[in-house]
């Protein structure tokens, strides 16, 4: 999603600019002043509503203006009608996708033209983004499920009509029910270090590893990453993470059945985020039939009397459509079984 409200920050004179990710409530926040007006922006991914939410506010009534469009880097049909932007298409592998941007303002006007929506003279603006594909994690159904439009019809409009405060409250309540389970205390950081921005503290830590508060923050940041990228009913955390910046990420953002997946889930049980482990457990169960077929087709795995093996194992790299590549990782199946045991034990 392209928003001129975000990009114009780099073109105008601004002061008191701050941006932060609040690990306590899982909300990204931006604040700055320009021409005597204070602008605030908040964004979060809502599990209860299954949407991304962005809220823009201006301290002076009628001061928020922005154009919204979709910068889609794959072939897609993009259109705007009323307060809704829609984009849809089919990827080269046959997977269908659709996304909707639904815009609601307080004050001002909303108009659509071509593939763009313009907001003028508003006090505030809430943007709800909903996206779906027809992917289904089921080998027997060839990984294809319900049409994305039918999925979106069930919840997108309802989420967009919900008051921003209610969306935010529901998100925070669900997020904190998991995040607040664990607190750590590694000591106290010196005041002159604690007041520095995180990038400077990370740099200073390399020279003098004495910043207990930073260590606590990084521990909780790791929990935040898993909490935000692996929930029941979703795909598990992948190589680059769900929220990486790429359309075409390195290694196709697949799964490497080795320490890459293992590191992502180190904190699932010890850090009291057991629900996050469920996505990996479901993924292993869904991939097992395809892995069994591939394992039995490999004659090198045959038993001494020449029969295919009864079990299965994995190759090092794997994608969500059951594809396996690179070298066989023969003990990989046992390692996945250990994850399942740890989850239920």
Predicted regions and their residues:
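Solvent-exposed loop and edge beta-strand segments that line ligand/cofactor-binding
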Residues: 204-215, 248-258, 320-331
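Single conserved hydrophobic/aromatic residue that forms the stacking wall/gate
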Residues: 1-6, 10
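Acidic, contiguous internal or C-terminal segments within carbohydrate-active enzymes
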Residues: 21-24, 32-72, 117, 121
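Active-site-proximal, well-structured secondary-structure segments within enzyme catalytic domains
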Residues: 169-212, 216, 233, 238-245, ...
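Active-site-adjacent "gating/activation" loops or surface patches in catalytic cores
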Residues: 291-335
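Carboxylate/His-rich catalytic cores and anion/metal-binding grooves
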Residues: 219, 226, 257-306
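Alpha-helical support elements that line or immediately flank enzyme active sites
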Residues: 54-55, 225-228, 261-274, 334-345
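Structural helix-adjacent loops and short alpha-helical linkers that scaffold large soluble proteins
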Residues: 162-166, 188, 206-215, 226, ...
């Amino acid at each position: 999603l392209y928003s001129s409200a975000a990009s114009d920050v780099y073109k105008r004179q601004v002061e008191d600019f701050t941006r932060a990710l609040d690990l306590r409530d899982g909300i990204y926040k931006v604040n700055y002043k320009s021409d005597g007006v204070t602008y605030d922006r908040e964004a979060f991914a809502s599990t209860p509503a299954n949407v991304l939410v962005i809220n823009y506010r201006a301290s002076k009534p009628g001061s928020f203006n922005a154009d919204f469009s979709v910068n889609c880097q794959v072939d897609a049909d993009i259109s705007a009608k009323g307060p809704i932007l829609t984009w849809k298409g089919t990827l080269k592998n046959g997977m269908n996708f659709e996304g909707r941007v639904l815009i609601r303002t307080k004050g001002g006007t909303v108009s659509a033209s071509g593939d763009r929506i313009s907001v003028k003279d508003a006090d505030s603006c809430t943007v709800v983004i909903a996206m779906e594909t027809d992917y289904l994690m089921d080998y027997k159904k060839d990984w294809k499920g319900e049409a994305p439009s039918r999925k979106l019809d069930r919840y997108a409009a309802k989420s967009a009509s919900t008051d921003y405060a209610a969306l935010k409250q529901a998100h925070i309540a669900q997020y904190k029910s998991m995040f607040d389970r664990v607190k750590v205390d590694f000591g106290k950081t010196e005041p002159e270090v604690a007041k520095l921005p995180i990038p400077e503290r990370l740099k200073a830590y390399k020279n003098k590893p004495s910043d207990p508060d930073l260590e606590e923050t990084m521990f909780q940041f790791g929990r935040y990453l898993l909490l935000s990228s692996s929930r029941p009913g979703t795909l598990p955390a992948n190589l680059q993470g769900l929220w990486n910046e790429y359309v075409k990420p390195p290694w196709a953002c697949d799964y490497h059945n080795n320490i890459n997946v293992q590191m992502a889930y180190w904190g699932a049980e010890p850090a009291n985020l057991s629900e996050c482990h469920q996505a990996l457990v479901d993924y292993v169960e869904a991939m097992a039939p395809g892995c069994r077929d591939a394992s039995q087709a490999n004659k090198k795995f045959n038993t001494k009397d020449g029969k295919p093996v009864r079990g299965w194992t994995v190759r090092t790299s794997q994608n969500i459509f059951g594809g396996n590549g690179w070298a066989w990782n023969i003990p990989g199946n046992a390692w996945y079984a250990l994850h399942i045991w740890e989850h239920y034990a």
